Amino acid sequence: MRKAGTGPVPEAPSDSPSGLTHHGKVITPEPTQEEVADMAAAYGRAAGEARRLGFDAVELHGAHGYLIDQFFWAQMNHRTDRFGGPDLPARASFAAEAIRATRAAIGPDLPLIFRFSQWKQQDYSARLAHSPQELEAFLAVLSDAGVDVFHCSQRRFWEPEFPEIDGEHGLNLAGWTKKLTGKPTITVGSVGLASDFIGAFRGEASRTRPLSDLIARLDKGEFDMVAVGRALLQDPDWAAKVKAGRMDELRDYDAASLAVLN
């Protein structure tokens, strides 16, 4: 996602499903169906290049308010053609087309991962699915299009996705996604740290957080894999230390780890 008028090519329009910001401000004409179809096809072309170059898997980023996620979000997708609609499964058609293009380009044997989130960088309180039923209908569209693994992004992985259903210690987003689709899932969100990434972008540090809850959830099969961000930026040996049980050697996060390495 690039803010209109910024580099590397300031005069180029910043695409969004309906040419709008999340506040409803018009920033560019709404793309035509042909232009949107070409955007979806571009994911396939890029994925084909990734396979040619020897990558082991492909992940499509459909989270955090970036382009694919904007098509999911009713606040930004006002389209009335095949790339929009009144409900979440209908608005998932762009993602499904990008997934099918990707699958066609990489073949049946290369893993295709799809990352999604409820929250957006434009609105941390946003939610796509308000119930397991809505989430299931949404995920079915993506799963049927060819997703192998779902990467389920939360700001804090330990938070239950639907506490009104299974309580304050209930399944997180990755747990519900695995339950509803039967597909492997990746959890992510402040793994190994006590506070989420928002503070990091404000220059705040974060203490380490015990991994006992994460390990317990893995052991019972709530999710299958774990993605780690800031903790690994702080300590490149994080995974090796965890594997060896050297938890006492894990380091607190310092915001300087986000600085450019000169």
Please give the residue ranges for each predicted region:
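Flavin-dependent oxidoreductase catalytic cores
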Residues: 1-262
